[in-house]
Amino acid sequence: MVSLEKNDRVMLARQLPLESVALILAGGRGTRLKDLTNKRAKPAVHFGGKFRIIDFALSNCLNSGIRRIGVITQYQSHTLVQHIQRGWSLFSEEMNEFVDLLPAQQRMKGENWYRGTADAVTQNLDIIRRYKAEYVVILAGDHIYKQDYSRMLIDHVEKGARCTVVCMPVPIKEATAFGVMAVDESDKIIDFVEKPANPPAMPGDASKSLASMGIYVFDADYLYELLAADDKDDASSHDFGKDIIPKITREGMAYAHPFPLSCVQSDPQAEPYWRDVGTLEAYWKANLDLASVTPELDMYDQNWPIRTHMESLPPAKFVQDRSGSHGMTLNSLVSGGCIISGSVVVQSVLFPRVRINSFCNIDSAVLLPEVWVGRSCRLRRCVIDRACIIPEGMVIGENAEEDARRFYRSEEGIVLVTREMLRKLQVKQER
């Protein structure tokens, strides 16, 4: 382990990101989000009023000083590719800065797509090697969080690690969805199990397990060696969590990096924020939290901005209808281009160009771009997909049986509405 002085850390915080390339795994389908990902990859799903989920990983790279980024795509990639081309063309090729889009190469005989997360990198190794990076940062493109990757890189170098895995404690009942690890006093990973049926508890806290966040740092040459060997292993599933990390744990080459050490927070006393938003309820809840008085995730931090594709839209407008009813909102996010006419919106998130007509009551709802709500509608505890037309007088979120018959209703009572579901009800989806 190398002991670094303060000045050394400042220098490395600038130097290490320049010697690194980030690879964002963005090919996931996100099946637990149900129909919300039928036509888009999970990283391309809208979030927070104006963003896409992948904007968080991309912004973390930019804010951390990593200006060489590869985005590995696969499932329903058109929307994602279009978003990155329109919103992330700010890098300078002359300065060797870029966002490369890396689609599935289909190089394996008999294989149409990537066999696993590790194979997604393996199939692009000829391109990745050209970046001539010293370190490779592997990221998931479908998580919501703010992290300074330069701090993680410093920790990687200071520990003399060949591989670093970012981790955080999670409730033991949720740990079955993660890779779970045990570490020694130096943070060396001494055991790693991917998605165990009975997750081991952390020492001293039987209610939690130490979970991998799917964020890794590798010495580049070491990663290339690992992937070459894994590619030849017919017994491997070619996945980082299932194969690569357990292997290097057995070899004693993997170290853990506690997420709180590099999590970016405006309030140092707050709990580190990281969300998978992999289920409809988690997605709905994370969006609505941003509209609360004191949200867990600070989106107003000018020192760590989240960037996205910015459309030229007029400001949101709240108008009085002919009967004298005023458009009003409370504890809500309302994006540009929205018009609220004589209706009440409470604890909700409205994405760009949403139109709500008179006499409506919108409560705890997430309305994606271009949703049009007819007069006298009541929407509660729901997610309305992009460009849906909700007909006059429709009620959603008040009758469980009716909601389950017409739309998708989760076990927690969150209702998802899409254009296809409305068409099946003979509701015209063109205006």
Swiss-Prot record:
InterPro entries, per the entry: ADP-Glc_PPase (IPR011831), ADP_Glu_pyroP_CS (IPR005836), GlgC_bac (IPR023049), GlmU/GlgC-like_hexapep (IPR056818), NTP_transferase_dom (IPR005835), Nucleotide-diphossugar_trans (IPR029044), Trimer_LpxA-like_sf (IPR011004)
Binding residues annotated for beta-D-fructose 1,6-bisphosphate, in chain numbering: K39, R419, E420, M421, L422, R423, Q429, E430, R431
GO molecular function, a single term: glucose-1-phosphate adenylyltransferase activity
Pathway it works in: Glycan biosynthesis; glycogen biosynthesis
Alphabetized UniProt keyword annotations: Allosteric enzyme, ATP-binding, Carbohydrate metabolism, Glycogen biosynthesis, Glycogen metabolism, Nucleotide-binding, Nucleotidyltransferase, Transferase
Regulation: Allosterically activated by fructose-1,6-bisphosphate (F16BP) and inhibited by AMP.
Enzyme class: transferase
Sites annotated Could play a key role in the communication between the regulatory and the substrate sites: Q74, W113
E.C. number(s) listed in UniProt: 2.7.7.27
Protein residues bound to alpha-D-glucose 1-phosphate: Y114, G179, E194, K195, S212
Function: Involved in the biosynthesis of ADP-glucose, a building block required for the elongation reactions to produce glycogen. Catalyzes the reaction between ATP and alpha-D-glucose 1-phosphate (G1P) to produce pyrophosphate and ADP-Glc.
The protein's assembly and partners: Homotetramer.
PANTHER family assigned to the protein according to its UniProt record, in alphabetical order: GLUCOSE-1-PHOSPHATE ADENYLYLTRANSFERASE, GLUCOSE-1-PHOSPHATE ADENYLYLTRANSFERASE-RELATED
Family stated for the protein in its record: Belongs to the bacterial/plant glucose-1-phosphate adenylyltransferase family.
Protein's UniProt name: Glucose-1-phosphate adenylyltransferase
Gene transcribed to yield this protein: glgC
